[in-house]
């Protein structure tokens, strides 16, 4: 007796299980992971979205909640499991998992605890998706991108840290607010280490090709009567402020990660400030990852833009590199 489905649908092609073309995996379904997931779904970037976490009930609940929104999305398959086989054939894997910093905990201790988590996660990702590109979002992102590169054995153009993509977006938003224009028309770059020691490249800030530093030569210095330097300070402080107010940050980083994925899956060759291996650049001698303007396309992170930096900016980059290396050199089991 034919089933209702058989009566309704007459097959034309053989029912072979198709390998997805644009599968994306998000590891970690906390606030950041789910913000990445919803941003990816909202931009219709994936034909399959996989979620992985160790908390099975939370994981299943998040999967079901997203699946129930399928009518309003263009992603036909949303799956989740604690077993990494669910991630097989991913084009891009976003890593948001990791342990949180405890009160009074040193960064080195936090990093070492996250290394121990990544030692389980990263080999599993590579086992099931050997051709993927990994985007690391977990903090401290520059060090954990290095850790991921070491543990994965992937070439450096396929291990990317979300880095200063969000810092630069915050910078452009805050400057654009002061000027009364849209952030996309206000160009400026935050480079280096994501977070406290990031570098604002004031010399490159422009609107419609007009250098703002030419209009105000003191811009970004302590002698600036308009105190533009405060904008960079606000960028650095903004995560702390949001965390103080709501407990975590998630929406902006989620949107920022989807932005990076779009450049890769659509082969756009757009330029983003993301964390990449900078050994040999700007006189940096160690294997550290810092944000520089990078071209992202279907092959991953294919090139780095040689930004003309001033001496003090280069000095700041090198200082960041030294700080990161001081922590990395003492990491165990890499």
UniProtKB/Swiss-Prot annotation:
The metabolic or biological pathway listed in the UniProt record of this protein is: Fermentation; pyruvate fermentation to lactate; (S)-lactate from pyruvate: step 1/1
Q: Which CDD domains match?
A: LDH_1
List, in alphabetical order, the GO biological process terms annotated in this UniProt record.
lactate metabolic process; NAD metabolic process; pyruvate metabolic process
Q: What does the entry list as the binding residues for substrate?
A: 107, 139, 170, 249
Residues carrying N6-acetyllysine? 7, 58, 119, 329
Query: Active site annotated at which positions?
Result: 194
Q: Where would one find coiled-coil regions in this protein?
A: none
- Tell me what topology the record assigns in the membrane: Peripheral membrane protein
Q: Which PROSITE patterns match?
A: L_LDH (PS00064)
Q: Where is the protein found, in the record's own terms?
A: Cytoplasm; Mitochondrion inner membrane
- Give its E.C. classification number: 1.1.1.27
Reading the lineage from the top rank, the first entry is Eukaryota
The record lists NAD(+) as bound by 30-58, 100, 139
Pfam families attached to this UniProt entry: Ldh_1_C (PF02866), Ldh_1_N (PF00056)
Keywords on record: Acetylation, Cytoplasm, Membrane, Mitochondrion, Mitochondrion inner membrane, NAD, Oxidoreductase, Phosphoprotein
In this UniProt entry, the residues modified to N-acetylalanine are 2
Question: Residues bearing Phosphotyrosine?
Answer: 240
Q: Which reaction does it catalyse?
A: (S)-lactate + NAD(+) = pyruvate + NADH + H(+)
Molecular function terms in GO for this entry?
A: identical protein binding; kinase binding; L-lactate dehydrogenase activity; lactate dehydrogenase activity; NAD binding
Task: Provide a GO CC annotation, any one.
Answer: membrane raft
Modification Phosphoserine, positions: 44
Q: Main subcellular localization, coarse class?
A: cytoplasm
User: What job does the chain carry out?
Assistant: Interconverts simultaneously and stereospecifically pyruvate and lactate with concomitant interconversion of NADH and NAD(+).
Tell me its family: Belongs to the LDH/MDH superfamily. LDH family.
Binding partners and assembly: Homotetramer. Interacts with PTEN upstream reading frame protein MP31; the interaction leads to inhibition of mitochondrial lactate dehydrogenase activity, preventing conversion of lactate to pyruvate in mitochondria.
UniProt protein name: L-lactate dehydrogenase B chain
């Amino acid at each position: 007796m034919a089933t209702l489905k058989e009566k309704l649908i007459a097959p034309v092609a053989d029912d072979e299980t198709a390998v997805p073309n644009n599968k994306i995996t998000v590891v970690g379904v906390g606030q950041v992971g789910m913000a990445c997931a919803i941003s990816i779904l909202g931009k219709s970037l994936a034909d399959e979205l996989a979620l992985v976490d160790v908390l099975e009930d939370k994981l299943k609940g998040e999967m079901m909640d997203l699946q129930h929104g399928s009518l309003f999305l263009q992603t036909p398959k949303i799956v989740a499991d604690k077993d990494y086989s669910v991630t097989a054939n991913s084009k891009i894997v976003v890593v948001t998992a990791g342990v949180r910093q405890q009160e009074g905990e040193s960064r080195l201790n936090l990093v070492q605890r996250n290394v121990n988590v990544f030692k389980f996660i990263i080999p599993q990702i590579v086992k099931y998706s050997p051709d993927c590109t990994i985007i690391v979002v977990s903090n401290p992102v520059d060090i954990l991108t290095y850790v991921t590169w070491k543990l994965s054995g992937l070439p450096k153009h396929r291990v990317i840290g979300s880095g200063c993509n969000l810092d630069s977006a915050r910078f452009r938003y805050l400057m654009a607010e002061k000027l009364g224009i849209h952030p996309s028309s206000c160009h400026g770059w935050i480079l280096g280490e994501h977070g406290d020691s990031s570098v604002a490249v004031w010399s490159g800030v422009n609107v419609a090709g007009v250098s703002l530093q030419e209009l105000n030569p003191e811009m970004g210095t302590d002698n600036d009567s308009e105190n533009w330097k405060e904008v960079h300070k606000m960028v650095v402080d903004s995560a702390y402020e949001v965390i103080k107010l709501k407990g975590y940050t998630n929406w902006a980083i989620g949107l920022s990660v989807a932005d990076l994925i779009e450049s890769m899956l659509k082969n756009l060759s757009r330029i983003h400030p993301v964390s990449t291996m900078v050994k040999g650049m700007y006189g940096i001698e160690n294997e550290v990852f810092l944000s520089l303007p990078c071209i992202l396309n279907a092959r991953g992170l294919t090139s780095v833009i040689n930004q003309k930096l001033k001496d003090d900016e280069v000095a700041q980059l090198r200082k960041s590199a030294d700080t990161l290396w001081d922590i990395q050199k003492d990491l165990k089991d890499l």
